[in-house]
From Swiss-Prot:
Homohexamer. The keyword Cytoplasm applies. This is Inorganic pyrophosphatase. GO terms for biological process: phosphate-containing compound metabolic process. Keywords: Cytoplasm, Hydrolase, Magnesium, Metal-binding. Belongs to the PPase family. Mg(2+) 2 binds at residue 57. PANTHER family: INORGANIC PYROPHOSPHATASE. Catalyzes the hydrolysis of inorganic pyrophosphate (PPi) forming two phosphate ions. Its cofactor is Mg(2+). GO terms for molecular function: inorganic diphosphate phosphatase activity; magnesium ion binding. It catalyses: diphosphate + H2O = 2 phosphate + H(+). Coiled coil: none annotated.
Amino acid sequence: MKLNVTIEIPKNSNIKYEYDRATKEIMVDRILHGSMVYPHNYGFLKEALDYDGDELDVLVFADQAFQPGIKVPARVLGAMKMIDGGETDTKLLAVIDVDPRYKHINNFKDIPLHWLAEVQDFFENYKNLQNKKVKILGFEDEIWAQKEYEECVLLMKEYGHLKKDEFVTKMMKERPEKYIK
């Protein structure tokens, strides 16, 4: 599945940017509290709403660090299932689609295991100094990722007009399995 990912956070950055759907701007949310940096480019899909009330997240594997707001053509290869603050916060995993160095990476099995280990380690630990816990539930392949994307596109079409807290409250009642305390 090929998608255009809007970059929120460049690879190797310790600045957590956040897209604001209401203002359509990318704002600085915080500086990471520790010495960790994002191991890969971190972006989102404007057309897809995840159960945390934000746009669906995508990690884009590439040699380059892309600036916030840039759209990057990417091939989605899988996903990491994650719970953050009790809310489902899926991360699609993708590679840049316009770099010949990545043309041999076409499905989840092609992703180097070390990349997956880096991603898991980062997200399990990047909030430690905030005393917040993140739980990684595992990785899934490109078929699962495509279904998750399609579900999140439907959520955006139906509920994208709601404020984040209104959406999460509604979904906690309708889809409680997506929220784990």
